[in-house]
Amino acid sequence: MSKKIKAIGFFVTAILVFAFACEPEMLYGTAKVAGSTPAGTNYEYGYSVCIDVTVDDQGKIIKVSDDEKNTEASIAADVIGAAASNKAYWKKYLSGKGFEKYKNLTIEDVKKMNVGFPGAPGVDAVGGATAASLAVKNAVLQALVLDASIKKLVNYKNPDNYKKGEQNKLEKIIKEGRAHLETLETYEEIEKALAELKQKLDALKTK
């Protein structure tokens, strides 16, 4: 094989690797629609928002969507007999272009968003749909924080720095920890669990 052909082959491979690395990633997030000024934080409206979050290779949001209408399906399940009003508020959120507020934001940007609380809307809430606004923010954060936390957990330690016995413990903590993170409902729970898992990994003895 000529040097020219080899060079072309390496160039094409490099392009493919770069393109794959820069390909957008779609994450999934969900959060219960909850909270009421008179009833408190534990009040639930009987449905969950279920959204997709597309991010670029830097973790910046490209798009938040619910193209499969999973939230509407959750509303239709009508576990508390409030489907009609829930559907109206969700429609108001969508018509208020709530998803567009997340374009180009990072995890930290989303955390800083002020959607307020049902009954006391913030500047980033969709008017008349504060509960939905809060739930979407929580769902977006759940998706982003879960993805980031799993990546941090997997890459937190280098297995080559441990003897075989400790390597096995490392792999076990990561495997079980990842499974646990995926069961958690809120981004706060995920962040707390990741910190605890890091402590377990820090306790392992290196070579």
Kindly give the residue locations of the regions a language model identified:
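Active-site- and interface-proximal helix/loop "cap" or "latch" segments in soluble metabolic
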Residues: 26-151
